[in-house]
Swiss-Prot record:
Protein's recorded name: Thiosulfate sulfurtransferase GlpE
Keyword Cytoplasm annotated: yes
Source superkingdom: Bacteria
NCBIfam families, alphabetized: PRK00162.1
Gene source species: Sodalis glossinidius (strain morsitans)
Cell compartments where the protein resides: Cytoplasm
Family per similarity comment: Belongs to the GlpE family.
Top-level taxonomy: Bacteria, Pseudomonadati, Pseudomonadota, Gammaproteobacteria, Enterobacterales
GO terms, molecular function: thiosulfate-cyanide sulfurtransferase activity
InterPro entries xrefs: GlpE_sulfurtransferase, Rhodanese-like_dom, Rhodanese-like_dom_sf, Thiosulf_sulfurTrfase
Length: 107
């Protein structure tokens, strides 16, 4: 995959629940600590090397940000780092929270 793709919240939720893809959250640490999707990996500049070393690069990665904008650049960047399939989740965390409010947790 040379270019990231977008994925709807519903499609992302289904792939995530089925274990078909990993979900990464690129929001700032305070926002992530205040609330995030259960099981989401907090991907930052500091955690990126460990993520790439531990993640099966053939397994799709779905990137979640605030509103679905920053995730596009992050998804494209992950492709340049060896991830084979990357998606930007449409609507981001805010839209996911409105659609599926009971799937979050805080630190």
């Amino acid at each position: 995959m040379d270019q990231f793709a977008t994925i709807s919240m519903e499609q992302a939720r289904e792939r995530w629940r089925q274990g078909e893809a990993v979900l990464v959250d690129i929001r700032d640490p305070q926002s992530f600590a205040a609330g995030h999707l259960r099981g989401a990996f907090h991907l930052t500049n500091d955690t990126l090397p460990a993520f790439l070393a531990q993640h099966d690069l053939a397994r799709p990665v779905m990137v979640l940000c605030y509103h679905g904008n920053s995730s596009k650049g992050a998804a494209q960047y992950l492709l340049t780092q060896g991830v084979e399939v990357a998606y930007s989740v449409d609507g981001g965390f805010d839209a996911w929270l409105k659609a599926f409010p009971l799937e979050t947790e805080s630190l």
